[in-house]
Amino acid sequence: MGDWNNSDAVEPIFILRGFPGLEYVHSWLSILFCLAYLVAFMGNVTILSVIWIESSLHQPMYYFISILAVNDLGMSLSTLPTMLAVLWLDAPEIQASACYAQLFFIHTFTFLESSVLLAMAFDRFVAICHPLHYPTILTNSVIGKIGLACLLRSLGVVLPTPLLLRHYHYCHGNALSHAFCLHQDVLRLSCTDARTNSIYGLCVVIATLGVDSIFILLSYVLILNTVLDIASREEQLKALNTCVSHICVVLIFFVPVIGVSMVHRFGKHLSPIVHILMADIYLLLPPVLNPIVYSVRTKQIRLGILHKFVLRRRF
């Protein structure tokens, strides 16, 4: 591809390639992704509606699950428009301003997911290690402040990224590797010195995903230590069972993130399609699987869904 310099352009335009080399199956892939988005949308909306309707679920743990569901909706909807435009409508062009906005939302929701998972780990820590103080520590006001802090942190760390990208010139082509805009994907097209942006991005990842994962791990070390001090084995299993759903969603989020990082750092020899699929998985897997995990593993939510969609229709 020839050089593409936007120095004189009013606004540069990027080309979203979707799945390079698999253009002949884009229509079939669009069906699969539409189904995945539909599952994510219906699952998270169901979780939100059940928690909203059932007064017995108006508790700290379920409020955090609601925040996670809202974030998962945002994460899936941030990639949906361009994904379907590329795969379904064969419309790969995207203006730079729209691209910057999309990557801002994608990365904000990603970091917000990590923040919410950390808050949920804190919820489990307080519930198991300090059960008598649980209602007084995690009040509605405190939960609201935690949610706001998570949002502000995510917005704050991501906001400089598109602001820096707006001042860059791009002379290494205009084709992006994915069906949506990602920070590193846009950055590699720049002919401006991008070390500041690149270093900032690395620092943000370490300070958010890295620190969050360490504190989540630490919380479970403390939880396990408390559980082992419980005399009754039945009570031990009961306490641990309340953490299973959260552990599952933590793995669903962090395992693909680690996989993407490993492939990006050490998988230069791999086919580009592997990198693309890994990015798609890490963005789409949590919104699709999280509501399924909570529907299957959390008894109160499962009963709420049955009451809302099955029992009410019978009567």
UniProtKB/Swiss-Prot annotation:
UniProt xrefs under SUPFAM superfamilies: Family A G protein-coupled receptor-like
PROSITE patterns to which the protein is assigned, alphabetical: G_PROTEIN_RECEP_F1_1, G_PROTEIN_RECEP_F1_2
Membrane-topology annotation of the record: Multi-pass membrane protein
Name of protein: Olfactory receptor 51L1
Keyword Disulfide bond part of the UniProt annotation: yes
Glycosylation site residues: N5
Residue ranges, Cytoplasmic side: 49-56, 123-141, 220-239, 297-315
Summary of the function given for this chain in its UniProt record: Odorant receptor.
Topological domain spans for side Extracellular: 1-27, 78-101, 163-198, 261-275
Gene field: OR51L1
Residues passing through the membrane, by range: 28-48, 57-77, 102-122, 142-162, 199-219, 240-260, 276-296
Disulfide bonds: C99-C191
The organism's taxonomic lineage, starting at the top: Eukaryota, Metazoa, Chordata, Craniata, Vertebrata
